[in-house]
Amino acid sequence: MAHQSHAYHMVKPSPWPLTGALSALLTTSGLTMWFHFHSTTLLLTGLLTNALTMYQWWRDVVRESTYQGHHTLPVQKGLRYGMILFITSEVFFFAGFFWAFYHSSLAPTPQLGGHWPPTGIIPLNPLEVPLLNTSVLLASGVSITWAHHSLMENNRTQMIQALLITILLGIYFTLLQASEYIEAPFTISDGIYGSTFFMATGFHGLHVIIGSTFLTVCLARQLLFHFTSKHHFGFEAAAWYWHFVDVVWLFLYVSIYWWGS
């Protein structure tokens, strides 16, 4: 093995990006099969492949950072830049949905009845479940900040408690969103209103599930004493992501639920 005279981590070849891409293909194809042919085989295969890929990839990253010490300060700096760029790309991703919503709602066409919401659409009451969801996510933003401060102060017990509260609030939000979808008086097929509503809120809900998974991994790592006040970028990245999800929901609530109703 050649001597390494620099502080950067030269990552070894890994199969997980390939299996991750394969799982994405299987999952999206499986969703199509489920929607049109009511077959869940391909979807379940994709989700299982995705879960196994996440487990193996996280395992490798934990080994490299916690046990082998490859995540030096320059490497952590690069990871921070990477996470910032990723969140920036997510901002533009959601900007597309907001653009579609405002393009349709600010100048409704005659086909929509000339007003917004379109004729025949009964919007959800923004002061019922959506307001509760807003409170839940804002509370989770407070608890994740509490967890971060507890970690910086080496208060392990409070960090675990706050992280667990955040995860439970994330799960509660997801359940509330699912119940709202089931009871909604319109569907994704109901024109531009249904399309923009379910695409924007649905992708946000997916991000909440991803964030909850991210935080659950952080909780498991904290229980195994992986984080210190000086070395905890995995948790920091999860906290950034969660705050991003919070902010996106506030824009969704004000735009689609409140103003759009």
Swiss-Prot record:
Transmembrane intervals: 16-34, 41-66, 73-105, 129-152, 156-183, 191-223, 233-256
Enzyme class: translocase
E.C. designation(s): 7.1.1.9
Compartment(s): Mitochondrion inner membrane
PROSITE patterns: COX3
Similarity comment text for this entry: Belongs to the cytochrome c oxidase subunit 3 family.
Mitochondrial intermembrane side: 35-40, 106-128, 184-190, 257-261
GO process terms (BP): mitochondrial electron transport, cytochrome c to oxygen; respiratory chain complex IV assembly
Source lineage: Eukaryota, Metazoa, Chordata, Craniata, Vertebrata
Subunit structure: Component of the cytochrome c oxidase (complex IV, CIV), a multisubunit enzyme composed of 14 subunits. The complex is composed of a catalytic core of 3 subunits MT-CO1, MT-CO2 and MT-CO3, encoded in the mitochondrial DNA, and 11 supernumerary subunits COX4I, COX5A, COX5B, COX6A, COX6B, COX6C, COX7A, COX7B, COX7C, COX8 and NDUFA4, which are encoded in the nuclear genome.
Protein's name according to its UniProt entry: Cytochrome c oxidase subunit 3
PANTHER family the record matches: CYTOCHROME C OXIDASE SUBUNIT 3, CYTOCHROME C OXIDASE SUBUNIT III
Topological domain ranges for the Mitochondrial matrix compartment: 1-15, 67-72, 153-155, 224-232
InterPro entries tied to this protein: Cyt_c/ubiquinol_Oxase_su3, Cyt_c_oxase_su3_dom, Cyt_c_oxidase-like_su3, Cyt_c_oxidase_su3-like_sf, Cyt_c_oxidase_su3_a-hlx
Keywords recorded for this protein, A-Z: Membrane, Mitochondrion, Mitochondrion inner membrane, Translocase, Transmembrane, Transmembrane helix
Function: Component of the cytochrome c oxidase, the last enzyme in the mitochondrial electron transport chain which drives oxidative phosphorylation. The respiratory chain contains 3 multisubunit complexes succinate dehydrogenase (complex II, CII), ubiquinol-cytochrome c oxidoreductase (cytochrome b-c1 complex, complex III, CIII) and cytochrome c oxidase (complex IV, CIV), that cooperate to transfer electrons derived from NADH and succinate to molecular oxygen, creating an electrochemical gradient over the inner membrane that drives transmembrane transport and the ATP synthase.
Membrane topology according to the record: Multi-pass membrane protein
Major localization listed first in the record, in broad terms: mitochondrion
